[in-house]
Amino acid sequence: MANRETVVKRLVSAVNQIHRWVDIVFPELRQVFKILTCKGALETLRLFPLPADLSKLEPNDVIAGWKKSMKRHSGVRRAKLLIELAKQTVGSSQATQAYKLHLEHLLEEYDLANTQLRRIEAEAKTVLERIPYAAKILAIIGISAIALAGVLGESGDLSGLYPRKHTAASRRP
C-alpha cells in the first residue's frame, strides 16, 4: 500500500500541474469545464492544447475531434463557447511550443499514474478475495476494499485476535 500512496501523490501532483498550466495558458477553459480532470476537458487539452489552435476551428471541427474519443461529446454550445473564449484568452501566448510539450508530458504523467493506480487497486481487491475474513469486514458499511487492504497491509493477519467476549472474560479478577 506504500506504493499506492506514492502513485496517488504523483497523480495529485500531475493534476495540480495541469491546473497550473491551464491557469497560465488558457484560464478561460474553466468557464467551459468546471472540473479539469473530466473526460471532456482532458480530451480537449489533448486534441487542442493551445487557444490559438482552437480559435482557428469551427464548432463542427471541435465536435468531430471529441467524437473520435468520446461516446457522448460536450455539445455544440460548449464547442462555440470554447472557440469564443480561445479567441479572447488572456493566457500566455509566448513559448507556445514549450507549453504544448509541457502539457503533453503532464497528460502522459496523469495517464500513467491513473493506470498504475487502477492496477494497484485491482491487485489489492484480488488479494482481499483470498483472505477468508475479509468479506465479513467488507460487509461493514463505510469500509472500502482499499481501506481494508491498507489496514491489513499495515497490521498484518487479524485472524489471531480473540473475540471481544473472550478478552473481557480474561480480564476479570
What annotation goes with each model-predicted range?
Residues 1-173:
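A detector of single, family-specific signature residues
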